[in-house]
């Protein structure tokens, strides 16, 4: 068996899971860099209690749940129906399904393979490193003898970028804008200053896509969303860009593969009230045929 596990932070599937998500996220040492785990757990509890009600209110506006789990499950189901070389499943970091339960579903021996596929095109310790570490620890804990392969960044992949360009131009044919905003999830500047590659990878990716789209847009803007707290984060903020823009724009969520609260609520709803300009949002790759084509080709090239 070749078991491919998509890795993501996850999204709450009900209002109760909002607290689970926040508690686990802020207890992640790659997110909240407090070395003492007891102190980190206490601070995570305080932050969770302060934020959970607001998060639940936001989720109510999306129908009470994030679409991330359903979309990822659909992606796995479609890939499993399309071929029989790989078995696809997914693991979340902060809400179910967790690594323990997913790995226990399968009987794996030394002749099998596990391919860990973080659904993040750019590397960051807060996403890729954290996800891989949790999975590798659980594989070791369960004494699974299968060979383990890991996938890191894929933002340079030609097929992946062809898909992005196709999705952008398809949306542009319905909403003719001359400005394209690439919105990436922000990170605290302190994490970047410690050597995290995320900002560099995002900048590189934007340059790749600008070259492919230069004949279709007059202006490209890279902005960062989802800032939390008083510390310095990557800039400019997507909300500030939209508040100061007067012309029509398209937004592509460049750091996301699957739609989630950050895209559906934050970009699609919350920022609408802040924006001066008329803008439209391009969906993430999700369970699209083009994304599946990229995934299968990428995996076949590993062998």
From Swiss-Prot:
InterPro entries: Ferrochelatase, Ferrochelatase_AS, Ferrochelatase_C, Ferrochelatase_N. Its EC number is 4.98.1.1. It catalyses: heme b + 2 H(+) = protoporphyrin IX + Fe(2+). The keyword Signal does not apply. Pathway: Porphyrin-containing compound metabolism; protoheme biosynthesis; protoheme from protoporphyrin-IX: step 1/1. CDD domains: Ferrochelatase_C (cd00419), Ferrochelatase_N (cd03411). The keyword rRNA-binding does not apply. One of its GO terms (molecular function) is ferrochelatase activity. It holds the Pfam family Ferrochelatase. It is an enzyme of class 4 (lyase). Its main location: cytoplasm. PANTHER family: FERROCHELATASE, FERROCHELATASE, MITOCHONDRIAL. Belongs to the ferrochelatase family. This is Ferrochelatase. It comes from Campylobacter jejuni (strain RM1221).
């Amino acid at each position: 068996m070749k078991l491919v596990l998509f890795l993501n932070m996850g999204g709450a599937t009900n209002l109760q899971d909002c607290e689970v998500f926040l508690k686990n996220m802020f207890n992640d040492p790659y997110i909240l860099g407090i070395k003492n785990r007891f102190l980190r757990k206490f601070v995570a509890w305080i932050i969770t209690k302060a934020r959970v009600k607001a998060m639940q209110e936001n989720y109510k506006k999306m129908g009470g749940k994030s679409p991330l789990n359903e979309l990822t499950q659909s992606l796995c189901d479609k890939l499993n129906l399309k071929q029989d070389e790989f078995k696809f499943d997914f693991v979340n970091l902060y809400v179910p399904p967790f690594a323990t339960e997913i790995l226990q579903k399968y009987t794996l021996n030394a002749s099998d393979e596990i391919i860990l596929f973080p659904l993040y095109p750019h590397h960051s310790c807060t996403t890729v490193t954290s996800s891989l570490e949790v999975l590798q620890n659980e594989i070791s804990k369960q004494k699974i003898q299968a060979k383990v392969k890991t996938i890191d960044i894929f933002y340079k992949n030609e097929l992946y970028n062809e898909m992005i360009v196709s999705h952008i131009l398809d949306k542009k044919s319905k909403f003719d804008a001359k400005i394209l905003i690439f919105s990436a999830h922000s990170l605290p500047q302190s994490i970047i200053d410690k050597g995290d590659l995320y900002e560099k990878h995002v900048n590189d990716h934007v340059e790749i896509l600008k070259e492919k789209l230069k004949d279709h847009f007059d202006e490209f803007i890279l902005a960062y969303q989802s800032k939390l707290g008083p510390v310095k984060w990557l800039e400019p903020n997507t909300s500030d860009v939209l508040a100061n823009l007067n012309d029509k724009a398209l937004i592509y969520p460049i750091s996301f593969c699957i739609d989630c609260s950050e895209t559906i609520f934050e970009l699609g709803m919350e920022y609408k009230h802040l924006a001066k300009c008329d803008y439209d949002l391009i969906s993430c790759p999700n369970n699209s045929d083009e994304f599946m084509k990229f995934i299968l080709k990428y995996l076949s090239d590993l062998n």
